[in-house]
């Protein structure tokens, strides 16, 4: 399964549970996580990776930057 297909599958499941899924496609910040999820005043970010995928140094930096602002960032690997 491609990383994109895995991301879509996961997002459909989240949407079925009431989460609003926002795909970050036109961001001016490179390395920003793939999606943002919102529900009942809760927010988290998700970066999706294929089985062999790994985070770039810039992605690690952005994730740490977001976490330093007390937001949750999940890194979700395909099983």
Q: Can you say where each PLM-predicted feature lies in the sequence?
A:
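Catalytic phosphate/metal-binding cores of nucleic-acid and nucleotide-processing enzymes, i.e., regions
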Residues: 1-79
């Amino acid at each position: 399964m491609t990383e994109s297909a895995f991301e879509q599958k996961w997002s459909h499941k989240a949407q079925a549970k009431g989460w609003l899924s926002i795909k970050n496609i036109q961001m001016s910040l490179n390395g920003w996580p793939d999606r943002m999820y919102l529900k009942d005043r809760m927010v988290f970010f998700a970066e999706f990776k294929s089985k062999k995928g790994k985070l770039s140094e810039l992605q690690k930096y952005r994730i740490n930057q977001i976490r330093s602002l007390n937001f949750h960032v999940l890194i979700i690997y395909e099983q």
